[in-house]
């Protein structure tokens, strides 16, 4: 009898501690995060207790305070929990209301042998802004590794002409079927690598992938150009659908760099020929293409602009802009062309001249743009890296250039030919699960 009373007392104390723990969780501030349960049994107990004692909205509020690693394990407790945590409603709620970490960089490296890695890089700390540190190697087999762009925590890669979508938070990797293009390269022509861009329509909460396929005369000429576009809705039963262009459409080849994704609109720079540049916009919701001419004055000094011009598409003050930096390494100057009126194709120009004390950061160094940060800084990186990896942050508002070293890159990547891509993700955690 005494033993039975003792067991009942221990059970009551255990339940009381659990109630106190949950009550403490509920009283936490919005920014507080719950520590993950130490074992599977406690995870199951917490899940059962939540469903029995709280309504669904309250359960979701509590779940949002757990780290993503705990949510991933909670999905294994039961089908009910898996359905709840994987629901689009909860994933969007988690993404839009919870800020777990500082914006960060993702670095994709690829060597001539086909070896690829994806590295997560911390943001510069307030105490020391001269370097950032590689935190995680997020590589998984078959991930792919070039032409990386991101939207809402999802990454888009291309490998062997197929698109892959990767969520670094959940490790989900989605491979899309190859496109059966209607255009075929004839003798004397070359088929450019397909370019993939991911976007999101917030109205219908739908993710879509856009692909541009182009053929032309053998490079460096861009004669006999022909291009087509395909769109893939990332949903159950999704498939590639050809986009019907508008009347003012111009066949073009996408620029190697110069892509810009603003959620519901995907934009990239392209060349209809060797001497004319355009900005191509694709509306994710309407699936319509728009061609915006770029002023010829941007590249008047270029002999063959499509081959020699160093310019990239960025966002500046909420507007689309072209950062022309061909003269940066020799003259320390760059031009910023801002699209003021899309309908009239009106552009304004602003010339930036580096401070003399910062000229050494760019002298005789060929740089490429790797995107912009949330506060408008342009991310520049050397085309070739040897003894160390670093990037430059260019504040266009204050005309200030800052060098930031990337520490922790594996030694095997030094002093060898490699290709790399960088992308800044302001909210880099997403729990969304995609189906096709």
UniProtKB/Swiss-Prot annotation:
The keyword Hydrolase does not apply. Signal peptide: none annotated. LRR repeats lie at residues 276-301, 393-416. The keyword Metal-binding does not apply. SUPFAM superfamilies: F-box domain. Pfam families: F-box (PF00646), FBA_3 (PF08268). InterPro entries: F-box-assoc_dom_typ3 (IPR013187), F-box-assoc_interact_dom (IPR017451), F-box-like_dom_sf (IPR036047), F-box_dom (IPR001810). It comes from the Eukaryota. This is F-box/LRR-repeat protein At2g40920.
